[in-house]
Amino acid sequence: AALEITRKASNSTISQKILFYAKSRRIDFVTHADWKEHQTLLKVHFPVAVHTDEATFDVQFGNLTRKTHQNTSWDVARFESCGQKWMDLSEGHYGVSLLNDCKYGHSVKDSNMALTLIKSGIEPNPVTDQEEHTFTYAIYPHAENWKAAGTVEEAYKLNQPLLTERNTKAGLDYSFAS
């Protein structure tokens, strides 16, 4: 099933197709933004019912954990963390992963997961990110922890989807079986 939403945000237009799958817990948010804002940060937040002291982030050579609380000045200064395809909050036998196909700024505070979608700063270009954007992020609730739940596999499915192409002239030259 799909739900389509279009919103105006100041001078920008954001259209989303929210996809629900019959045989998957993953919910995809296929987003197109015609972004015209100046010095504005667009984030998505997911407050979740997961209580844990650590979040796990995908990074270029594996994964790492970071604290979810802000007990020290160092914690407060770390308002955003880098990550690649996913971040996860898990406790006991339940968790939620936030997957994405091209966004690298994550934040988590207590049980609130967030992903930076667009940052229209002024350096090095005064019109940075003031253009059309298309990206997908997904929320993936799961049992167990991120490893047992297949979060890495779900992130790869999102980032490298199976593509099909209809070709009526292929014949035996392009057959997998011949």
PLM features: what roles do these ranges have?
Residues 1-178:
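C-terminal (or distal) subdomains of carbohydrate-active enzymes
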